Amino acid sequence: MNAFDRARQSAIAAAREARGTYRNGLVTPTAGVAPGMTQANLIALPRDWAYDFLLYAQRNPKACPILDVSDAGSPTTLLAEGSDLRTDIPMYRIWRDGKLAEEVSDATQAWAEHDDMVAFLIGCSFTFETPLQEAGIEVRHITDGCNVPMYRTNRACRPAGRLHGEMVVSMRPIPADRVAEASAISGRYPSVHGAPVHIGEPGRLGINDLSRPDFGDAVSIKPGEVPVFWACGVTPQAAVMASGVPFAITHSPGYMFITDVPDSTYHV
């Protein structure tokens, strides 16, 4: 086995170890965990709503880039052998009639309420944070050991069937002289949101106060830095709320599903 293969096997082992700790009850944001491995957002819906969401994602690929779709009733994915989507995420959200009913570290009981749940794994921008760091671009929420800040915007997504809502974005402060580089690096990963959707001027997105994110934690913006916004996989949760979806299970923002797929797989 050469050095590349050893590094790849080590990264996969780290991903599997992380999923095991979450299955055993550890609750922590996943930014910076298992560097080099693809992370994913989750939304699981009864089969009756699955086509609506599939169409919603197809019409809004920047915010909802699908990496995998499970068979109805199956809590497994080919992106992580031996995993269980009901237990291997640190924190889940259970939604009822468009409202957040509870957050749990194990979704097995809620999942069992419907025998035809269809799970969608959606690309996450955590995936390209390792390449940003390797280029010497600081990722502030990793430095600070907190969750990434996420914001609802005034940008409407294209509706599909019974689903509608606005785009959610994540924000990372980037030095002004490195914004173009950060955009180019992330742009090489279109399956995990790709390049930013907006740079600077948060008010144009309807964001009035960066210190009060709708999801996640606020981070500092230093002199000479610019807030840079990427489409975010929490967008489906905004659609669940806006559309009054009767039942859904999602990851909690910032608490992702870590796959066995290297981030280089989605590099173009």
Curated annotation (Swiss-Prot):
What Pfam families does this protein's entry cite? D-Glu_cyclase
GO MF term set: lyase activity
User: What's in the keyword line of the UniProt record?
Assistant: Lyase
| EC number of the protein | 4.2.1.-
Q: Which domain of life is it from?
A: Bacteria
Q: Identify its protein family.
A: Belongs to the D-glutamate cyclase family.
What's this protein's name? Putative hydro-lyase PSPTO_5379
The organism named in the record is: Pseudomonas syringae pv. tomato (strain ATCC BAA-871 / DC3000)
